[in-house]
């Protein structure tokens, strides 16, 4: 896929010159370890080839932002710091992580891949400190401050197994599955309608009874997860978090 990825990214960057185009390369280990976790022999080498080409492309496409992403799971939680250090040679514009979760779309339900709370806690603390210590300015400083809070939020969710702050999935965020199904999020993955059946009009689904029922379930805290996509929207709608982030940005911490 290297040629196809580079060609399409180049085209997107060219046609959207006033937008930042972000691309995440997901790496869960170094070399063979990454291949073993992903179950795809040779994936590391192909990823490196793609990354090298993208870094070269970035020289002529300044609006391209390249990020390295690691999914923290039971398979790599014990040596995360080694993996983190081992990926720095790639010199990404940013480095992010997410907690591994059992998801229908990834066919990982029942696999028990979520990291143990005690194993993830020091990882979260390390990542929060790294985010806060990065010498960035402007909107990047705000992004890093929210990122630092996200890692702490994820840690608490794993320990407490409940919504630490209110979840607005199904209101502030949603998920469109490849077949057109609308989910409140990719963790519950409960279809509330299909865009193909409404001529791609979201409104009948969004304001329908099935979505309302799912929203109530979420409001009643019948689920909890540390999924990044929903968590960032939730933090933006949580005044105490926004206030803390604002103070950190002002104080430069």
Feature map (PLM): residue ranges:
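Radical SAM enzyme [4Fe-4S]-AdoMet core and its adjacent flexible, acidic
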Residues: 14-183, 187-197, 238
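Residues that form generic nucleotide/phosphate-binding pockets
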Residues: 8, 37, 126, 130, ...
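Flexible mid-to-C-terminal extensions adjoining Fe-S/redox cofactors in radical SAM and related proteins
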Residues: 164, 179-253
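Distinct, well-ordered alpha-helical segments
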Residues: 2-11, 80-84
């Amino acid at each position: 896929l290297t040629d196809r990825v580079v060609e399409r990214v180049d085209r997107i960057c060219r046609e959207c010159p006033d937008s930042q185009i972000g691309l995440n390369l997901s790496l869960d280990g170094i070399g063979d370890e990454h291949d073993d976790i992903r179950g795809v022999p040779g994936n590391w080498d192909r990823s490196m080839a793609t990354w090298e080409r993208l870094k070269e492309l970035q020289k002529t496409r300044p609006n391209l932002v390249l990020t390295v992403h690691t999914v923290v799971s039971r398979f790599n939680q014990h040596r995360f710091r080694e993996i983190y250090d081992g990926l720095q040679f790639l010199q990404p514009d940013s480095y992010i992580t997410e907690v591994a979760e059992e998801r229908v779309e990834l066919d990982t339900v029942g696999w028990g891949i979520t990291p143990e709370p005690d194993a993830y806690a020091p990882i979260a603390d390390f990542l929060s400190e790294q985010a806060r210590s990065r010498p960035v300015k402007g909107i990047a400083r705000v992004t890093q401050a929210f990122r630092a809070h996200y890692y702490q939020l994820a840690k608490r969710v794993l320990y407490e197994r409940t919504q630490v702050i209110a979840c607005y999935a199904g209101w502030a965020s949603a998920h469109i599955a490849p077949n057109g199904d609308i989910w409140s999020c990719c963790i519950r993955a409960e279809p509330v309608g299909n865009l193909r059946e409404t001529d791609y009009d979201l409104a009948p689904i969004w304001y329908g009874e099935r979505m309302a029922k799912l929203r109530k379930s979420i409001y009643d805290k019948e689920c909890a997860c540390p999924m990044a996509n929903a968590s960032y929207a939730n933090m933006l709608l949580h005044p105490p978090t926004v206030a803390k982030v604002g103070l950190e940005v002002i104080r430069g911490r």
